[in-house]
């Protein structure tokens, strides 16, 4: 039964979503409807949480705008998300970065992954995908 649910969910998942993890900085292009007009709004921030799987997968993005921290939770299969770009790959050792909320300025920065670390990370994810299915 579980395998059947997974196969059905695959139809509803967007195929053009890049792989990103907690600690990465992402730029989301959101479709916003204001009255009769429709426009694209860009929301760029740090991924502090990823939870769930399949169509129920959500991720939380945090950005600081004019000194005010702002967090938004997005479902991975959200129809208002036009495009997701990974701006930077972050080097973190936690699955949830809630501690970032209490930090200010330079202390809230996440170290960026080196080029060879990104390639290693991609190779590991490819190997795990091949092993799982």
From Swiss-Prot:
Gene3D superfamilies, per database record: 2.30.30.790
GO cellular component, one term: cytosolic large ribosomal subunit
Classification via InterPro entries: Ribosomal_bL19, Ribosomal_bL19_CS, Ribosomal_bL19_sf, Translation_prot_SH3-like_sf
GO biological process, one term: translation
Keywords carried by this UniProt record: Ribonucleoprotein, Ribosomal protein
Entry GO MF terms: structural constituent of ribosome
Signal sequence, renumbered to the chain: none
Similarity comment text for this entry: Belongs to the bacterial ribosomal protein bL19 family.
NCBIfam families: rplS_bact
Function: This protein is located at the 30S-50S ribosomal subunit interface and may play a role in the structure and function of the aminoacyl-tRNA binding site.
Name of this chain's protein: Large ribosomal subunit protein bL19
Gene: rplS
């Amino acid at each position: 039964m579980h395998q059947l649910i997974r196969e059905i969910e695959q139809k509803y998942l967007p195929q053009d979503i890049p792989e990103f993890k907690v600690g990465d900085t992402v730029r989301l292009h959101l479709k916003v409807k204001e009255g009769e007009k429709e426009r694209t709004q860009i929301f760029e921030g740090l991924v502090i949480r990823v939870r769930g799987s399949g169509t129920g997968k959500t991720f939380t993005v945090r950005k600081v705008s004019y000194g005010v921290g702002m967090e938004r939770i997005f479902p991975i299969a959200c129809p208002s998300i036009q495009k997701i770009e990974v701006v930077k790959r972050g080097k973190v050792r936690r699955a949830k970065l809630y501690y970032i909320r209490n930090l200010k300025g330079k202390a809230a920065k996440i170290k960026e992954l080196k080029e060879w670390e990104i390639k290693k990370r991609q190779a590991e994810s490819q190997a795990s995908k091949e092993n799982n299915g």
